[in-house]
């Protein structure tokens, strides 16, 4: 789903969206936020524009919908909703979680609603993000216990993805992970978030191979 495209329009922390959250939860429908949706990412012009727009105006706004859901009480009210930020990398996630919690604690005088858990806990229980290549993020995944929240993708057919060299991309950044950690990041986490039936998928694969 799209984020708000400028400050004049209500974002997902507004209670007017509660009927939508109710339907999403009742349908057990996971939701995703893709980079470059919502605000126009083509904000910088001239020298360096391609890099500036990608880093500053495509990736960073992905924090906003996550903060909206985790800090506003949406996930507290709708605890079965699962959400994922897509194609935005993972290295920024530990910082964002710490930043949300720090703001909630230190701005407690005007932070509302008062939540029974810290904002980061709602991401850990209900959220995920995807990446193509992010070695820094993978190091932090282990250190900050976020292996269950990260999902690898090859972003086919886009040029910033890893296809057709996905195997090499996986090996050069996941060599320090255990087999269990790799399995989660390479598929099991996605199966959980998107309600895939692993056994059914494996059966279809085996049938196709045979």
Model-found features: residue ranges?
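Distinct, well-ordered alpha-helical segments
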Residues: 13, 43-45, 97-99, 138-143
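Aromatic-anchored helix/helix-loop segment that forms the rim or "lid"
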Residues: 57-65, 108-139
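Mid-to-C-terminal alpha-helical segments outside catalytic/metal-binding sites
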Residues: 72-73, 81, 91-92, 128, ...
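Glycine-enriched alpha-helix->loop->beta-strand junction motifs that scaffold or abut catalytic
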Residues: 25-30, 48-51, 78-81, 123-128, ...
């Amino acid at each position: 789903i799209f984020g708000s495209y400028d400050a004049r329009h209500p974002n997902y922390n507004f209670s007017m969206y509660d009927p939508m959250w109710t339907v999403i939860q009742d349908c057990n429908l996971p939701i995703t936020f893709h980079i470059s949706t919502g605000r126009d990412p083509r904000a910088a012009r001239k020298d360096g524009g391609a890099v500036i727009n990608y880093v500053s105006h495509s990736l960073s706004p992905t924090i906003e919908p996550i903060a909206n859901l985790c800090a506003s009480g949406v996930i507290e009210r709708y605890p079965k909703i699962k959400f994922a930020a897509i194609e935005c990398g993972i290295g920024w996630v530990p910082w964002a979680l710490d930043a949300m919690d720090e703001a909630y604690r230190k701005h407690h005088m005007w932070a509302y609603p008062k939540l029974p858990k810290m904002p980061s806990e709602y991401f850990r229980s209900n959220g995920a993000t995807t990446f193509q290549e992010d070695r820094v993020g993978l190091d932090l995944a282990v250190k900050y216990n976020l292996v269950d929240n990260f999902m690898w993708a090859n972003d086919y057919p886009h040029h910033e993805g890893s296809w057709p060299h996905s195997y090499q991309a996986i090996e050069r950044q996941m060599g320090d992970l255990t087999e269990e950690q790799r399995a989660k990041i390479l598929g099991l986490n996605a199966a959980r978030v998107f309600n895939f039936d692993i056994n059914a998928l494996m059966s279809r694969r085996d049938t196709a191979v045979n």
